């Protein structure tokens, strides 16, 4: 038996019944970004691939519209 117990990852979007991820919802998007501004992979967050693709598109749109910075060198 392993020493450490890993908590099961679950998809937050599936649990809350969210149909589509909005690029204007900055608080949700920031939960899936690292300190440096990189998108956290689904194997770490437990997000389903459908929502991970939507999340990636939403983050890229928000970056393009200057709602979220590309790197950590800029203030949020």
From Swiss-Prot:
By what name is this protein known?
A: Small ribosomal subunit protein bS18
Q: Which domain of life is it from?
A: Bacteria
Subunit field text: Part of the 30S ribosomal subunit. Forms a tight heterodimer with protein bS6.
Q: Which family does it belong to?
A: Belongs to the bacterial ribosomal protein bS18 family.
Q: What does this protein do?
A: Binds as a heterodimer with protein bS6 to the central domain of the 16S rRNA, where it helps stabilize the platform of the 30S subunit.
Q: Which gene encodes it?
A: rpsR
Name one matching Pfam family. Answer: Ribosomal_S18
The family database entries (InterPro entries) matched by this protein are listed as: Ribosomal_bS18 (IPR001648), Ribosomal_bS18_CS (IPR018275), Ribosomal_bS18_sf (IPR036870)
Q: Does the keyword RNA-binding apply?
A: yes
**Keyword annotations from UniProtKB, A to Z:** Ribonucleoprotein, Ribosomal protein, RNA-binding, rRNA-binding
* One GO BP: translation
Q: Name one GO cellular component term.
A: cytosolic small ribosomal subunit
Name the Gene3D superfamilies for this protein: Ribosomal protein S18
Q: Which PROSITE patterns match?
A: RIBOSOMAL_S18
């Amino acid at each position: 038996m392993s020493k450490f117990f890993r908590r099961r990852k679950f998809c937050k979007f599936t649990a809350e019944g969210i149909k589509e991820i909005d690029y204007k919802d900055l608080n949700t998007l920031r939960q899936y970004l690292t300190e440096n501004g990189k998108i956290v992979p689904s194997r770490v967050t437990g997000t389903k691939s459908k929502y991970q693709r939507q999340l990636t598109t939403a983050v890229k749109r928000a970056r393009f519209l200057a709602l979220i910075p590309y790197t950590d060198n800029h203030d949020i």
